[in-house]
Each structure stands twice: as structure tokens, then as C-alpha cells.
């Protein structure tokens, strides 16, 4: 949580699943972003693109907050049971993957996430963000976790 000023009032803003996207001219911007706005990254899945965006002046309507990812369309458990290793290979295309096994990546399958292009389109159509660049993944490295 962070203390921030909105409409002359100090508020405690807690962003869960969101990130700050300060527009141009916002007093909390570092000097290097004062004229442009502070870039925010909105990641897609490990097999799709991610975007770097700028908040517009309308972003103040959301306390200068924007979602910090595409969002899931299915749970990790469902993704593990719904997708096969072969499905994952198709979904990943030419993205290089390094993991202890393809099975360990199933819960992060690209089709378990919303379409990042549609998410960005919605934010732009709502007048909240302006996309600067779309990034495409070249490789994914998944470390070992405690999951089985």
C-alpha cells in the first residue's frame, strides 16, 4: 500500500493485481518521466506478447492503476488437467523453454490466459492507456518450485 494524493485528499492505495501507471505531468513522476508519463508493463502469458503502456490523463479515474497482467481464464489446476505436453508445444510456437519438464509448465499454458491484445484494446478503448511497444517472448526459464 502507498500513500497517494488524489483530488486534494491523501489516500492509502493498495494495488492487488494492478500496477501504477502515472500519466504525463503527474507530481509523483521522476523528472525523466514528467513530460511523458511513467511506463507500465502489462505481461501476457509465457507464449504471447507483453506490452509497455503509458497511462493517459483518464487513468486518474482508476487511481492511476492498471492491471498488471492479462489475467487467467482458467485455474492452474484446470490448465494442468486440460492441456497436454503436445498442446503446450503448439501453443509456445518458437519460444524456447527451459524447465525441468514440459509438464511443469502446463499450469502456465498460454491458452490459460486472456488474450493480451484484447486486454490492451479494452484499456485503450476505455481511454486509460496508450501502448508504446509490444514485446514478444524469445525464451522462458522456469525454475524449480516446491510443487510436485
Positions of PLM-derived features:
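Domain-length cofactor-binding catalytic modules of enzymes
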Residues: 1-148
Amino acid at each position: 500500500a502507498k500513500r497517494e494524493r488524489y483530488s486534494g485528499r491523501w489516500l492509502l492505495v493498495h494495488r492487488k493485481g494492478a500496477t501504477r501507471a502515472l500519466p504525463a505531468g503527474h507530481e509523483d513522476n521522476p523528472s525523466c518521466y514528467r513530460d511523458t508519463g511513467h511506463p507500465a508493463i502489462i505481461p501476457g502469458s509465457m507464449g504471447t506478447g507483453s506490452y509497455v503502456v503509458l497511462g493517459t490523463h483518464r487513468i486518474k479515474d482508476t487511481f492511476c492503476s492498471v492491471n498488471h497482467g492479462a489475467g487467467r481464464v482458467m485455474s492452474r489446476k484446470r490448465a494442468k488437467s486440460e492441456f497436454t505436453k503436445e498442446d503446450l508445444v503448439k501453443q509456445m510456437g518458437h519460444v524456447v523453454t527451459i524447465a525441468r519438464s514440459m509438464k511443469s509448465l502446463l499450469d502456465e499454458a498460454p491458452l490459460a490466459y486472456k488474450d493480451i491484445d484484447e486486454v490492451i484494446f479494452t484499456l485503450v478503448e476505455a481511454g486509460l492507456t496508450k501502448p508504446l511497444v509490444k514485446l514478444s517472448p524469445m525464451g522462458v526459464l522456469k525454475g524449480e518450485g516446491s510443487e510436485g
